[in-house]
Design a protein with these regions (language model features):
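Surface-exposed coil loops of outer-membrane beta-barrel proteins
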Residues: 1-64, 229
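Transmembrane beta-strands of outer-membrane beta-barrel pores
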Residues: 41-45, 79-83, 100, 114-120, ...
């Protein structure tokens, strides 16, 4: 499972995933610290849309600061403002990534990311008689942590083994009607050929809600995963 629940939800809100727009970026040095930057403007509709459903635009920026290049430790800072159906929306986020080479066979990667923003999709799905007047009363907040351990085998066609276990916490309306979803996704991967030429993974996605709600998708469940990837 490549995408986190958080990434998927913020993609629906127009901040991540596939968006139509323009972006410029570059790099500079802050003393001895390398910094990458990017500034973007998108229509926030996502991909495969026939036309833009409103005149609003979403503006965002991202900074990536190289804290410890020897361990590939980077700090990412994200922020965005925009308008959706003439209502102001926002999103902010922070992430840390790192990679440590333990020895000639073992490597460890780690990612942690937290985001918060306006859940304007939820706001616009409610009638004016039951919602508040401010879209920013409807806020989504999430965090995930993903450690990954890799063992290089290089034995015949089997190149490496990977084990990861992602923990996620996501609450799509934490201010007014909190019902956080916690997800645990352990995965075991087998890589064949070089550079992920072929790989298959086995794992489980386990979802837990604070409150289970009948006749909705907000209920505890387990999903077995078998995934095959190949590059040509």
């Amino acid at each position: 499972m490549d995408w986190s629940n958080q990434y998927t939800e913020f993609g629906k809100l127009g901040w991540t995933s596939f968006q139509i727009g323009a972006s410029v970026g570059g790099t500079f040095q802050l003393g001895k610290i390398p910094v990458q930057y990017a500034v973007s403007v998108v229509n926030g509709n996502g991909k495969n849309q026939i036309n833009d459903n409103d005149n609003g635009k979403q503006y965002s920026t991202r900074l990536v600061v190289g804290l410890a290049p020897e361990y590939n430790v980077n700090l990412g800072l994200n922020g965005g403002l925009g308008k959706v159906f003439s209502q102001k929306v926002y999103a902010v986020g922070v992430d840390i990534t790192g990679a440590v080479k333990i020895d000639s066979h073992w490597n460890m990667d780690m990612q942690i990311e937290a985001k918060q923003g306006t859940n304007h999709i939820l706001y616009n799905s409610l009638t004016s008689t039951i919602r508040t007047t401010d879209p920013n009363d409807y806020l989504i907040r999430g965090i995930y942590f993903l450690p990954s351990l890799r063992y290089e085998i290089n034995h015949h066609h089997l190149n490496a083994l990977e084990f990861s276990c992602r923990y996620e916490y996501l609450d799509s309306n934490f201010r007014l009607n909190s019902n956080p979803r916690q997800t645990l996704t352990p995965m075991l991967g087998f890589e064949f050929l070089k550079n992920y030429g072929a790989r298959f993974q086995l794992g489980m996605q386990m979802d837990y809600y604070k409150k289970q709600i009948e006749n909705t998708n907000q209920y505890n469940n387990n999903l077995f995963i078998f995934q095959i990837q190949s590059r040509f």
